[in-house]
Structures are given as C-alpha cells and as structure tokens.
Design a protein with these regions (language model features):
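Active-site acidic/histidine proton-transfer and metal-coordination neighborhood
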Residues: 56, 71-176
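Histidine-acidic metal/acid-base catalytic patches
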Residues: 1-4, 9-21, 89, 97, ...
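Glycine-rich, aromatic-flanked loop segments that form ligand/cofactor-binding clefts
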Residues: 50-64
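Glycine-rich, proline-tolerant flexible connector loops at the mouths of alpha/beta enzymes
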Residues: 28-54, 115
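Conserved beta-strand positions in the central sheet of alpha/beta enzyme cores
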Residues: 26, 63, 108, 143, ...
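A short acidic, helix-capping loop that chelates divalent metal ions and anchors anionic groups
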Residues: 33-37, 72-77, 115-118, 150-153, ...
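N-terminal small/glycine-rich loop or linker at the start of catalytic domains
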Residues: 1, 63-78
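Active-site-proximal loop/turn and secondary-structure-junction residues that shape catalytic pockets
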Residues: 9-11, 29-31, 67-70, 111-115, ...
Length: 280
C-alpha cells in the first residue's frame, strides 16, 4: 500500500519526502476565504506549477482535499443550502477539473450541514447531483469525509452510516467515502469498525491519532485511542486500494531538520504496520 502525506507547509521538502520513502501527496486546495483567488484565471497555472514540483520530486498526487468551509465557523450567508451552493459550487467544479489535470482521480469533500438532518441531506443530494457530470467527465471519485461541527458536535456526517447514505443513494463509481480517523475518534467512533462498515465504499483516508474532543493530527500510534494494527488489517480485509494517507501536522516552530525527522518517524510507523506478520 502506498504511503502519502498531506502537503500543508511542506512545499520545499518534496525531494526529501521522496527520499524518506513517501509515494505521494494529499494535495490540499486553498481555504474557503480565497474564493476570488481560486476562481481567478491564473489559478490553474499556479496549481499546476506546484504539481510539477511534486511530480519532479518523484511523488504522485494520491488524493486531493477540495476547498471546504470549516464546521466551527458561523454558516455562510443565512445558513441555507442555497447560500452554500452559491459560494462553494463554482470552487468545487473548478477544483475537480484541476484534480484530473494533476493526474489524480480522488477528491475528498466536506459536505454541507445544518441542524436539520432532512435539510442537510436534501442540500447535499442537490450538490452531489450537480457535481456528478464534472466528476464523470474527468474520471474523479468524490470521497465524502466524516466531519464534525461546532464544539465537535454531530452534523449528520459523523458515522459510516451517514456517509453510506449518499454512496447508496447515487450508486455511482464517482461517489465514495473518505474516513478521517481523528474525526471518528473525536466523535467517539471506532475507525476499525468504520472501515468494516464502509467496505468497498472506502476510497480515501485521513489517518491521524487523536483523542475525543480534539483534532490533534498526530501520527498513528502516538496516541493509543485506536488499535492501529487492527485498523490496517481491516483495510486489507475490505480490499482498500487507496493510499495510507496521513493527515498529520508537525509541531510549530521546528527546524527543517526536525520537521524531516518528524516525517521520517511517521513514515516508519506506517511502514511498520505493513510488515508481514511473524508466524507463531
């Protein structure tokens, strides 16, 4: 299984990450507040320049993270789906097309939510339906991520069953699930059980250690809130074909040498989970 790492703050380190042993990068598009920049004419060339630096280092784009509106902020506009779509849909359509231009076919997304389960689902069904033609045109899979809302609360997108509602509704090769292990833990969900429930619908991972009520983005095995060996074994059991993608953050203020040591440790941990088991 390929091992990948999110690209936040690592732009100069791509050759070093390849040397450590990483196979790919989880490419994060800019934050929601940069809408004008994303929709500008020169945005594509800027993104593709970064992609070329990654490719020149011998790394692939394992998956992307589409621009999202953070769940802890006040809702966009009046909080209705119409306001969310008006702001986000043009961004998402452009980024899906760019994903394919980076030779990647997997895009994680944070869906819309509000207090009402029915209205949340109604809005998201509209959103995905409007994204489907572009997803199909470019051969990109939309991987719906489990997320939380204000105060780490439930937003009808926290469980495997929440994600499978959309996968089962569309029954499309272009709609799957992204399991964020840290988000699962903070919502007191078991990532091992989530993998088993998602099965073949699981297309992407955001792997990181966490504890309930936080979003720490530490390497796997650093916090014992998950049986990581069982987690990896569950991935194999369901036939997961994506990358073991770690969405981790080095402590702020580290030197480049220390940052690389952090990523070397993380890669070694991931690799150790994949070692053949000794026969008893």
């Amino acid at each position: 299984m390929d091992i990948s790492i999110r690209n936040r703050g690592i732009d100069p380190l791509y050759p070093d990450l390849k040397q450590i042993g990483f196979d790919g990068v989880d490419f994060g598009f800019p934050g929601w507040e940069r809408r004008e920049k994303i929709l500008a004419e020169d945005f594509e060339s800027t993104i593709l320049q970064t992609y070329r630096r990654i490719a020149d280092a011998g790394l692939q784009i394992s998956q992307v993270h589409l621009t999202y509106y953070p769940g802890h902020l006040p809702p966009l506009g009046s909080g209705t789906y119409a306001d969310f779509e008006d702001y986000m849909l043009p961004i998402l359509l452009k980024e899906i097309a760019l994903t394919a231009k980076m030779n990647c076919h997997l895009a994680a997304i944070h869906l819309y939510f509000e207090e009402s389960l029915e209205k949340s689902r109604e809005g998201n069904l509209q959103l995905i339906q409007k994204l489907l033609p572009t997803l199909e045109e470019h051969g990109v899979i939309l991987a719906i991520e489990n997320i939380f809302g204000p105060g780490f609360g439930d937003v009808h997108l926290s469980t495997a069953e929440d994600l499978l509602f959309y996968v089962d509704h569309f029954k499309s090769d272009c709609v799957g699930a992204c399991l964020d292990t840290g988000h699962a833990v903070t919502r007191k969900q078991n990532p091992v059980e989530a993998v088993r429930k998602l099965g073949s619908a699981l297309k992407a991972l955001h792997v990181h250690s966490n504890v309930s009520g936080h979003d720490l983005h530490m390497p796997p095995c650093m916090i014992r809130s998950v049986d990581w060996q069982k987690f990896y074994d569950a991935l194999l059991a369901v036939g997961y074909r994506g990358a073991f993608n770690m969405e981790i953050s080095p402590p702020a203020g580290l030197s480049q040498k220390a940052t690389l040591a952090f990523f070397t440790l993380a890669h070694g941990i991931a690799e150790s989970l994949m070692l053949p088991k000794a026969e008893s």
